[in-house]
């Protein structure tokens, strides 16, 4: 999105959609994404009110984009409503919601001459993409497994934890064996 007017606003929308889809929390998404991108947008010359409005409007999109905890809970409470159908509907609604915000952000950014971001170098893009693939694959595994019926939503959560642990330990090397007791204790306390 680098050279598109309002590029940082579009990044905010996409970041909220992805973060929110994993966390199923608009508050967590808006805090995490907005906490990083709003100051950056202001430093780049965006109006703080515009940056905040984009963040607030886009934070809830992730709640309807699968894997959506709200849809999983609805399916359980409604007596087995099809999670696949709910997820497909969520993709459509969430994507249109995010796209709508991006169109409005584009028009406002163009009108106010908000700066674009310099085009990234080829080597930088490929490096970032290589680093992101294992994390993005988590979403594909969860959603693909549920939609194909390979596993249930509850089983998907266990698979997600195991996969996340494996890539954190062996690919990103950010978690060590010694960290596991503390992580397990925190997980128990949070649940």
Predicted regions and their residues:
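Alpha-helical transmembrane segments of multi-pass membrane transport proteins
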Residues: 1-191
């Amino acid at each position: 999105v680098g050279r598109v007017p309002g590029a940082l606003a579009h990044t905010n929308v996409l970041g909220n959609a992805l973060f929110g889809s994993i966390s199923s929390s608009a508050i967590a998404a808006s805090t995490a994404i907005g906490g990083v991108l709003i100051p950056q947008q202001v430093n780049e010359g965006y109006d703080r009110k515009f940056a905040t409005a984009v963040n607030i409007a886009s934070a809830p999109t992730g709640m309807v984009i699968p894997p959506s905890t709200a849809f999983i809970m609805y399916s359980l409470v409604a007596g087995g409503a099809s999670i696949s159908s709910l997820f497909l509907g969520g993709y459509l609604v969430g994507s249109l919601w995010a796209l709508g915000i991006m169109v409005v952000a584009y028009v406002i950014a163009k009108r106010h001459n908000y700066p674009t971001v310099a085009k990234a170098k080829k080597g930088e893009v490929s490096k970032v993409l290589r680093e992101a693939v294992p994390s993005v694959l988590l979403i594909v595994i969860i959603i693909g497994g549920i939609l194909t019926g390979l596993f249930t939503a509850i089983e998907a959560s266990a698979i997600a934890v195991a996969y996340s642990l494996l890539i954190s330990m062996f690919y990103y090397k950010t978690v060590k064996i010694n960290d596991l007791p503390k992580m397990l204790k925190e997980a128990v306390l949070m649940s």
